[in-house]
Amino acid sequence: MATTNATLQTLVQFYENCKNVKTRYKIINGRFGKISILSHKPTSKLYLQKTISAHNFNADEIKVHQLMSDHPNFIKIYFNHGSINNQVIVMDYIDCPDLFETLQIKGELSYQLVSNIIRQLCEALNDLHKHNFIHNDIKLENVLYFEALDRVYVCDYGLCKHENSLSVHDGTLEYFSPEKIRHTTMHVSFDWYAVGVLTYKLLTGGRHPFEKSEDEMLDLNSMKRRQQYNDIGVLKHVRNVNARDFVYCLTRYNIDCRLTNYKQIIKHEFLS
C-alpha cells in the first residue's frame, strides 16, 4: 500500500508540474491512441503522453516498453496508469522527425544514409526479437531518425505481439508479408519483410516496390498477386546493385528463399 501511495503521489506531482505544448514536428494521433506533448516546467524536459481507449489497449505495448526501456533505439517509459475507460503511457519525447517526414524534407535519401539507418533498425529489431516479440508495424512513420545524434528510434509498440501468437490483418497493408496476408502465426519474418519495403521507400523517395505508379493505392488482392511475381527486375528504381539485392532478398515471395535470419541479414553487403 505504501508503495502504491508513493507512486500515486509522484504521478500527481508530475502532472502538477506539466503543461501541454506544441512541437516543431508534426504529431499525428493514431487510430487507437491520442497523442499529446507535455513540458515538465521544473526541468523543461518534454514527454510524450499516449492515451488509449481500454477497448483498443494491448498489454504487450507496456511489456515491450518495459523490456526495451534502457535500449538506446527504443523509447523509455516513465509512467503507465489507467482507468476503466483509458490507459495512459508517459514516455520520452524524441525531438526529431519520423522517416516519412524525413523523406518529405529531404526527398530520396543517399545510399550511405539509408544503409546506416537500416543497419541500426535491424540491430534494434534483433534485440526485440530476442525477447520473442514481433513489432508487427514497421513503417516509415514508426521509425525516427535523430540526425544530430545519428540514432534510429523504433516507436509505437501498440501492435507488438508474442512470436507464434495468432496474426490478423492489423497494421499497414503495404508492409504486409505474404505470411501475414495468409494469417500464419506471428514470426520475425513479418518485421524483416517490412524492413525490405521500408528500405525501398527510403531509396526511391517513398515508392512501393510493387506499385505501378506513384499515386497507386495498393489493395490486398494487388499485394497478394504482385508479391508472387516479385523479381529483382521489378525493383528497377533502386540504382545501387547491393541495395537492390538487399530489398529483393528481404521481399522474395518464397520464405525459404528469403532472408529472415538476422545473422544473414546483417552480413549483407548493403549493410557493410
Curated annotation (Swiss-Prot):
GO terms for biological process: viral capsid assembly. Pfam families: Pkinase. Residues 21-271 form the Protein kinase domain. The active site is at D137. It catalyses: L-seryl-[protein] + ATP = O-phospho-L-seryl-[protein] + ADP + H(+); L-threonyl-[protein] + ATP = O-phospho-L-threonyl-[protein] + ADP + H(+). Belongs to the protein kinase superfamily. Ser/Thr protein kinase family. This is Serine/threonine-protein kinase 1. It comes from Autographa californica nuclear polyhedrosis virus (AcMNPV).
